[in-house]
Amino acid sequence: MRRFAIVASQAPASGTFSLNDLPGSGRMDLICRNIGSALLLSHGIRNDAEAIIHLLGGPGKPRRVRFRGIDMTGLRPDERSIAGRIRTVLEEPLPPVGIWKEVSQGISHSGGTLGQTLAEWASDGVIAFRLDRNGSSLDSIHDIPPDVGFLVGDHRPLEAPDLEVAIHSLSLGENWLLGSACISIVHHWLDSQEGNPSPSP
């Protein structure tokens, strides 16, 4: 399973937001692109991937929303459609930290921070990496674990208090890339390592 922990430092964790102004809603447009890159193929949904977005912009406590490809149905690639799924989740009361409550098929939510996600991953045997320009080259990883997770930040660098635990950093090159591009590169690299490179459109 490939897992992506996506940080949304300014996206609302409760209440509502306008589908007509996703950039002004804590850059929800970028978050939706990340989800699309993590889960969608040209003609289907990846059943080997999940994405957890961490909504940290308040009001109230942080909320995590999990999209599981293997259970997902009807996810469309446009940002507005994905944002609508997230907005529906925000209408629900926030579950306790560590308790995942399903809102619709393939989509569930829970309280908690990025540190909670890393703890859950560790409990499940997931090996986690942070995507960072200053990390080791992606090609330096030769033995890919069956369950692997990647942390994807937004415009704000991930700091030690966010992570709560030490984690190895991997670089995709010298330039800062959009999160959605990083996720696509990781998928292509993993597909290639498995002998099944992602086809060109």
Question: What would you call each of these model-derived segments?
Answer:
Residues 120-123, 139-145:
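A short acidic-Thr-Gly-centered motif at the start of a beta-strand
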Residues 16, 63, 139-141, 160-161:
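Short glycine-/acidic-enriched loop or helix-start segments at secondary-structure transitions
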Residues 129, 139-143, 151-153, 162-166, ...:
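Structured N-terminal alpha/beta-domain signature
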Residues 33, 149-150, 184-188:
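A generic structural signal for well-ordered alpha-helical surface patches
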Residues 156-201:
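Structured adenosyl-cofactor binding patch, chiefly the S-adenosyl-L-methionine
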Residues 110-114, 131-139, 147-158:
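Long, charge-patterned amphipathic alpha-helical coiled-coil/hairpin "stalk" segments used as oligomerization
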Residues 1-132:
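RNA substrate-binding interface of SAM-dependent RNA methyltransferases
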Residues 19-21, 67, 143-146, 164-166:
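Short, glycine/charged-enriched secondary-structure capping and boundary segments
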